[in-house]
Amino acid sequence: MIKKFDKKDEESGSGSNPFQHLEKSAVLQEARIFNETPINPRRCLHILTKILYLLNQGEHFGTTEATEAFFAMTRLFQSNDQTLRRMCYLTIKEMATISEDVIIVTSSLTKDMTGKEDVYRGPAIRALCRITDGTMLQAIERYMKQAIVDKVSSVSSSALVSSLHMMKISYDVVKRWINEAQEAASSDNIMVQYHALGVLYHLRKNDRLAVSKMLNKFTKSGLKSQFAYCMLIRIASRLLKETEDGHESPLFDFIESCLRNKHEMVIYEAASAIIHLPNCTARELAPAVSVLQLFCSSPKPALRYAAVRTLNKVAMKHPSAVTACNLDLENLITDSNRSIATLAITTLLKTGSESSVDRLMKQISSFVSEISDEFKVVVVQAISALCQKYPRKHSVMMTFLSNMLRDDGGFEYKRAIVDCIISIVEENPESKEAGLAHLCEFIEDCEHTVLATKILHLLGKEGPRTPVPSKYIRFIFNRVVLENEAVRAAAVSALAKFGAQNESLLPSILVLLQRCMMDTDDEVRDRATFYLNVLQQRQMALNATYIFNGLTVSVPGMEKALHQYTLEPSEKPFDMKSIPLAMAPVFEQKAEITLVATKPEKLAPSRQDIFQEQLAAIPEFLNIGPLFKSSEPVQLTEAETEYFVRCIKHMFTNHIVFQFDCTNTLNDQLLEKVTVQMEPSDSYEVLSCIPAPSLPYNQPGICYTLVRLPDDDPTAVAGSFSCTMKFTVRDCDPNTGVPDEDGYDDEYVLEDLEVTVSDHIQKVLKPNFAAAWEEVGDTFEKEETFALSSTKTLEEAVNNIITFLGMQPCERSDKVPENKNSHSLYLAGIFRGGYDLLVRSRLALADGVTMQVTVRSKERTPVDVILASVG
């Protein structure tokens, strides 16, 4: 029956695409009708439509066949049929890039452009500008100037929009039309004024002073076009973000005044601009929030949606500013548009008090099954934020999330819930068992491999430390029996972690691992064999190295290094220290909840891997070993100065490479042979400088300085460098960018650059700190006590220590429990050269904070460095 229905439907043509089965060769054959006399407009229109359809579907036209069809089409200009003529303009625009000698229609288009038929003039201008190149533009310049100030709005708008496109081809010619564009900007037509403002801005956007003057002029004289007002607000907002005046600027006053405009579009644009300004206080946000509050009760769904979506964004940073809208948002919970209702309730979750959480969760439960997965993810995001804000409400959240987890839904939705539950488990120790129980139940019927492996990893990490770890073994071993290879392998790893940390469970785990050795998959068998052999040794140090604490190196970096090792066989064993460290351990990274993810995630090279590759390509850096760590960029110039310079410190075992990213902001200068000369304050030795060959206006360039670390005193890791940028200046024409032949040497003093102890240490997470502590041993252990007299709270002390040392807090020890007078902070890292470094800091609060620091490493130097730096 279904097949019969489909056939009938296809024959009747109802709902089908008449161009679905077009063949290019047949259409080009039909195009010969263009040469017939007299011209048949109706048939020609149909064929042109087919050609446009094929072009827009991505059909490839060869140059010869496209040119033949184009030349045949030019004969259609002999017809006076308006629809056919306008279809010709469209076809010219589409075929301009694939046909040869398209300029043959220039005279016909120029004639239409300057003719008396207004209906032809606008489209003719757009088509003409599409086929015109830089050499021909001057020939039509006079006509373009006239068209820009034409009284017919469609002609003027066409000329202005075409001018915007022509800027890419010949900016200097279009710049001569600025007077006409200014005249068009005073037009009464809203679209002409909008397009004219766009042209004026793009002609001046590289000159901040000219943009400021333009804004000044239009903010004082006012505009008639609401579209132009929106553009003006965006320009003002962009300028505000770049200047230091901020909210004291007249530009901010202008944006605020637009909140009182008669057009809703302008009011919303102004409110959105204020909300997205950086460093906006709650007081400055208040007028914008008030306007959005009014929009919440608008009869137009689009306005209500825009308002609640924007308030949702405000609530992320300034929840207190949105509190005044809570009543309006509660009214929107019952909105017929489920998207609006969802955004309203998620906003309320961010702004509501702890007492309102239960009521809001009940309201969400009533309609959550009716909304799309995309908005369910938004709800989960809001719940996740709420868990961090009100940790005592985790039981309510957990119940709600577990119910959502049982409902039908796609991968992204399920992943968002799993990530949220994992976050609650990690942040609230008292919710651990309930969360793990819900996740165990979920993996019993989970069709997503990624989620199953993630949950198994969490069970292996958190399960062994629960009061009754044995209850999780059944759920994990079920995965070995029932699931695919990837999940079975993850389950084997989780079982090994239970055996490594629970002596009473070890015999049972060994039996289960022996069963896994009979698996059909290589990966599962190899893991089982490996873990079985490690566990049979019954050594805590081995367990810590090979089971608890995974690889701390970059996975893409390791893959590349191993591939290189196989290409160049060597008698030496592969050195793991030749691989860059991972910026953050794989198991520490929390997956961000995203609204859309269409492709499977590919492990992309990290920032560290990219730097490693860039530096390895420079001959001077070939023999200094693998990259250990790259710092965050440090700015060495003030904003609004002639040159913008920032530095990234690349640490190697015995060297530092300073990478200077330089930008020349002067359009009348070309800088050449740019270097940064560094004068160290201590026993650092500057070895070489690698210049940036040239720095044209606004184009970034990179220069490097190579420095050797002190040999005589390994603990002298901190230092200060005075920096001076030296270069050759060649003056140039700001308009053309052509430089003078002669240049002169000049220099520019930069801010001093500091190297601190944190630059020499890479963060690394140890999931089981106690095991790692025992693994390192006490051979080079040292302990000292310090008084932090200026520190008043334990939280402040913890944050200062973490920031100063640049190490990774373990066991969630960076969170200080409430109403405690003592706390233990556990830090882990790797010191330059690849040495494990562990710090245990016991803090006690009295008049100030007293700190007992114990440091362990397998080498003496890292221990001495930490104690010397803290002291």
UniProtKB/Swiss-Prot annotation:
Keywords: Cytoplasm, Cytoplasmic vesicle, ER-Golgi transport, Golgi apparatus, Membrane, Phosphoprotein, Protein transport, Repeat, Transport
GO biological process entries: endoplasmic reticulum to Golgi vesicle-mediated transport; intra-Golgi vesicle-mediated transport; intracellular protein transport; organelle transport along microtubule; protein secretion; retrograde vesicle-mediated transport, Golgi to endoplasmic reticulum
Entry-linked SUPFAM superfamilies: ARM repeat, Clathrin adaptor appendage domain, Subdomain of clathrin and coatomer appendage domain
Subcellular location, record wording: Cytoplasm, Cytosol; Golgi apparatus membrane; Cytoplasmic vesicle, COPI-coated vesicle membrane
Signal peptide span: none
Spans of repeat HEAT: 64-101, 283-320, 321-355, 356-392, 395-430, 467-504
Topology versus the membrane: Peripheral membrane protein
Sites of Phosphothreonine modification: T594
Assembly mode: Oligomeric complex. Binds to CDC42. Interacts with JAGN1. Interacts with TMED10 (via cytoplasmic domain).
Family assignment from sequence similarity: Belongs to the COPG family.
Protein name (record): Coatomer subunit gamma-2
Species whose genome carries this gene: Homo sapiens
